[in-house]
Amino acid sequence: MKPKTRGEAEAEITQAVIKFEKEYLGRGPLDARTFFVHDMVLIRLRGLLTAGDRKLAETREGQSLLKETRRQLFESSITVFEEMIAQTTGCKLISLHTDISSKTGERIIVLTTNTNLEELYR
């Protein structure tokens, strides 16, 4: 079997994250991009807020509630990301960080691995 190119691996992670968002969180992004930066996988998702989320985000308390709820849901599913990274890259996931903008509906996900992915996919 031919090894994956960097673009193929990034695209595979993008598709897996879109599937995760739809299955676990109920809605997929309008746009998704994945980038390898040293030992990190940077994922940018746009258009994640529902009409209800946008209404909730009109107050500061609602914004905090939205961010915290989404963060907890996301971080409770870390095993999904461990498997995704292992299957796609053969690397081990070290940590997961995420935040969502309650104004734009953009989520940034940073996955740190045990391998320099830029060197792995030269």
Please annotate each region the language model reported.
Residues 1-122:
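Interaction-mediating elements
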